[in-house]
From Swiss-Prot:
Transmembrane segments: none annotated. Pathway: Protein biosynthesis; polypeptide chain elongation. This is Elongation factor P. PANTHER family: ELONGATION FACTOR P, ELONGATION FACTOR P (EF-P) FAMILY PROTEIN. NCBIfam families: efp, PRK00529.1. Its main location: cytoplasm. It comes from the Bacteria. Gene3D superfamilies: 2.30.30.30, Nucleic acid-binding proteins. Involved in peptide bond synthesis. Alleviates ribosome stalling that occurs when 3 or more consecutive Pro residues or the sequence PPG is present in a protein, possibly by augmenting the peptidyl transferase activity of the ribosome. Modification of Lys-34 is required for alleviation. The gene is efp. InterPro entries: Elong-fact-P_C, NA-bd_OB-fold, Rib_uL2_dom2, Transl_elong_fac_P/YeiP, Transl_elong_KOW-like, Transl_elong_P/YeiP_cen, Transl_elong_P/YeiP_CS, Transl_elongation_fac_P.
Length: 187
């Protein structure tokens, strides 16, 4: 397995920490006035999302993780697993609830996603930045009611987003999956 020296470490690199994949989010080289120089490495564990920091001497190394980001098409969910297919090879993988990481509420079928694979197993799914979903349930907007600035709406996938008062049930809206916010109505 490959390893990185402290001079080679950069943001975005995938490493193994205690046999768990992580991505480096920040590195800082520190040279104190007295003593040996060291590097502070901040990383985020891919599976749990926890951020941790470690201080490494310049002679230490970090083990590279065999993590691959692959473009895949979402096919369907059987209730327990979400199935994805690679477009070129038609190879299919299935992700469980932990591997989905909350992305399941934005997927209805045939969306292109970035699936993070570790040893051939999905450990993270990134849905498209914007999705168009139909509103299945929302309160009717009352004329003159502008106090709240919005109302909750349930989408066809079960996700709940805050929408403006003029948006009605059975309309299709565009949602930003990174923030979970309403963007616009779809004509």
């Amino acid at each position: 397995m490959a390893s990185y020296g402290m001079n080679d470490v950069k943001n975005g690199m995938k490493i193994l920490v205690n046999a768990e994949p992580a991505v480096i989010t920040d590195t800082e080289y520190v040279k104190p006035g007295k003593g040996q120089a060291f590097t502070r490495v901040k990383y985020r564990l891919i599976k749990s999302g926890r951020v941790q920091e470690v201080t490494m001497k310049s002679t230490d190394t970090l083990e590279a993780a065999d993590v691959v980001d692959t473009d895949m098409q979402y096919l369907y969910s059987d209730g327990e697993y979400w199935h994805f297919m690679q477009q070129e090879t038609f190879e299919q993988v299935q992700a469980d609830k932990n591997g989905m990481g909350g992305a399941e509420k934005w997927l209805k079928g045939e969306e292109q996603c970035v699936v993070t694979l570790w040893n051939g197993v999905p450990i993270g799914v990134q849905p498209p930045n914007f999705v168009e979903l139909k509103i299945t349930e929302t309160d009717p907007g009352l004329r003159g009611d502008t106090s709240g600035g919005g109302k909750p709406a349930t989408l066809e996938t079960g996700a709940v987003v805050r929408v403006p008062l003029f948006v009605n049930q059975d309309e299709v809206i565009k949602v930003d999956t990174r923030s979970g916010e309403y963007v616009s109505r779809v004509k």
